[in-house]
Swiss-Prot record:
Bias-annotated ranges (Basic and acidic residues): 751-766
Source organism per UniProt: Cryptococcus neoformans var. neoformans serotype D (strain B-3501A) (Filobasidiella neoformans)
Tree of life domain: Eukaryota
Function of the molecule: Involved in concentration and sorting of cargo proteins of the multivesicular body (MVB) for incorporation into intralumenal vesicles.
Ranges in coiled-coil conformation: 449-493, 585-626
Positions of region (Disordered): 751-779, 795-957
Identification of the protein by name: Vacuolar protein-sorting protein BRO1
InterPro entries named among the record's database cross-references: ALIX_V_dom, BRO1_dom, BRO1_sf
GO biological process: protein transport to vacuole involved in ubiquitin-dependent protein catabolic process via the multivesicular body sorting pathway
Amino acid sequence: MSVQSPLIAVPRKTTTDVDWATPIRHVIAASYGEDPNSYAEECAVLQRCRQDAVRGAGNDQTARDLLYKYFGQLELLELRFAEIKVSFPWNDAFTDKLTTQTSLAFEKASIIHLISSILSSLAQSASRSDPEGLKRAYYNPRATAGMLTYINENFLHAPSTDLSREVVHLLIGIMMAQAAEIFTEKLVEEKKSASLVARSANQTASMYTSVVDEMKEFQGKGVFDRNWLYVLQIKAKLFGSLTQYYKATSDSAAGKHGTALVRLKIANSLIQDAQKQASSFIYTFVAASTPSLPHDAANALNEIVKAHATVCGEAKEQAVKDNDLIYHEVLPSEASLPAIEKLPPAAPITIQDVYGNQEVTKLIGPDIFLRLVPLAVHESASVYSEEKAKLVRAEVDKVELAEGEIQAGLDHLNLPEEIDRWRQFLEGDTNDDVPLSQQLKSLVDSVGDVRQVENDLGRLDGERGACERELRELNGALDAESRECERMRAKYTPNFTQSPSGPQTANLRSNLSANLSALSSASTSDAHLQSLWQSIQPSISLLSSGPSNLERAARDITEGNSQKIDKTVSLLDLDDEEVDRKALGQEEKDALRKAVDDGREKLDRLKKIRAERDEVLRDLKEKIQTDDVSNLLLLNRRSQNVEPQLFASELEKFRPYQTRLAAAVSASRSILQELDMLVAQVHKGTGFREILRKEKDRQRIIRDWEKRLIEAGESYAEIRAGLGKGLSYYDSLRRVIEDLRMEVQRFTNSREQERRNMVSDIETRQRLGGTSPSTGGVVANRGLEERLAALKMEAPPQPPRLGTTSTPNLPPPPGRGSSNVTSSYLPPPPPPKPQSNPYDFSTLAGFGSFATPSVSSPQHVYPSQPQQAYNQQSYIPPQQNPYYPPPPSRPTYASPPFAPQQPPMQSGHSPYAPPPGHAPQPQQPQYPSSQNQQQRQGYEYPGYGQQGGYGGGYGQY
């Protein structure tokens, strides 16, 4: 067909610029709580996008693409700003009336109407003579109909005429009729069967007839151009004629010549009417007044009608002649002719199909306000992220479980070391190196120099002996002071009134005895350390010799020379230690060689599978990390209960990764089973079993030897810890002894000064009184002095000598003999105390400068009347003497317990000097009672027995 049939295009709506920025900024500030200024660029992009779409382009593909983009952004914009109010002015496409609304739906409907106008214009201008133009001409009317259908289905209340349901429905009918027309033209052009062309033409004629009937209802309303009606009427009659013509051709071919002749007459009648209308349309059509039609619409339509009229006329005349001369068939009436079937019309292309195209998606581009995500979308995205995290955790758990099974299986089979050992058996590699455990190697590095331990053991003995000597010296000083006091009392009785020192030194003596008992326990701990060191010294010397000597010793043991290293290793265990490498037969060697090759191949394959599995897991994690469904959630925001289906469909993207991971896990387990079977098969060989037995014996001996060395190392660590505690204990005991020494010195010096003053006062009074001791008194005094010289002061039970388990005994006073004479005024010895912990000094927590007792020391008041004679004086025990109050209960102090308390001193004279006219009333320094001492075994720091420190000592193993 040389002339192209004219098509009708939908008129275009027009508009002016709008302000997007101000309403969007207001919504961002009010609803999202963000800074609107940060979205100024997005607002400008949206503003420019609208201007380009509605004003910057014509009726070409560029205009269509810009409109596609703008409408897509409107869809995304509505998801975030559904209630935004912007004034959108649009002029009606048919009446040119201005309509302004603030609804975003009005803007969307107007843009869709404008898109349909552009699509219909593209269909109108497409050249149908080439295949590509024909495709566009057939596609665009259907896409236009789909766009208009979307308007009718989604925008119910039209604010303008061009968006009303009746007008839009009429436009849809015109577009679909034109699409059917183009399809019929294609069938005619391709010379398809006459019956098929007749059916398609009948459908086209029916659609045009329906549109003509609808348009007649708008007559006189000034909506549609009257030229549209002329074109539609002409096309309705044209395609009706085409229907009858091609059906007649089909009937004639079928031998129905009478029916064919009747149909040709009908076709000729219809085309004659169409020709009359087309001829008049040429004179009434003005192209400038109807821009929706091509400028040559009248001429083109007239040419098409005229050409078909000529064909119909010739065909009718020929059919009449043939029937009159040849067929002589009776012509049926028109009413009796069978109805012609209609070809089903093509469906409109929906807007979803248009925007589902990848090219259109690329045109839309990313969301302009991508950074602005509603809270509901954030919440849904968080739920999806948790679903992804569950998926990843499940796959990671499966992979970790599979890896653990593989590692446990390889460790159980001792692979790949077992295969290397098989290779050594085959190659006769007699490597005598004995691998040492990592624990033993670490122990070698930690032993260090053993000479320091021997030096510290020597220091312990020296410190213990020095402490014992000093404590006994302090006991001796107290004994000497007590003897001197009693000697003066016997000499100057009854005028010598100095109180006995026994009650005053009870606590000091108790402290000294407790320290000696503690030294006895410390001696036991020291002896235990010494014994333990002697038992492990050879092993520790070997460990300290370095890794090379240790490996040499291990080789000596495996070679049967254990007497050089460890006498506890039985030579009977090493009789068969030298493995006979030639115990395998040739058949077993061949089988073992094949097993080595198979094992290596399977291990290599297992390594590749593990690497591939880990790579797939990394890819899965990266894929899940970068996966974002916020846009999909935003698009489906208005849908109800869509999240489960959406999440399920999105998670299906990761199904291939899960499948690959499952396959890798299954393959690794299969290979592990094959390796297990391979090792079991190799171990079944008789010669190999013998080799394994000897190797196991060899390994057992080495492990036992290593175990003994490790136990020696643990004992060595205990010795070093005990030495540290013991030396710290003796250092602390030294400080306590020094405090006791100072207290004893203060006490003895004070007592000596008091005696001097008292003796001087007695001698002065005797000289002034002119009296002298009587001869009998002198004789009596001499006898008493002789008895006192032989007097042996009763001391508390002595602790045993160091190295024994009993309490050491204090030495007798130097220079005095033993005597059974006891003075009636001497206090009874303190009750024996249980063996004390040498490190627990909590019993002396209230002495000296370390702490102040919680109760003040009471002063002992003596009567002022003359004292009884020495041989008439009776001793009152401390618990019955009213001048000696009971000792206060021992408080708990944080200070060192054995530091004695210094008695109060007065400047200028002795605290024990009596006031004038009175007998001396010395202030007795009081010491806390040690009745409730808690005893422990081992070393403890003095003063720390109850407040931390080292507690029960190092000596308890």
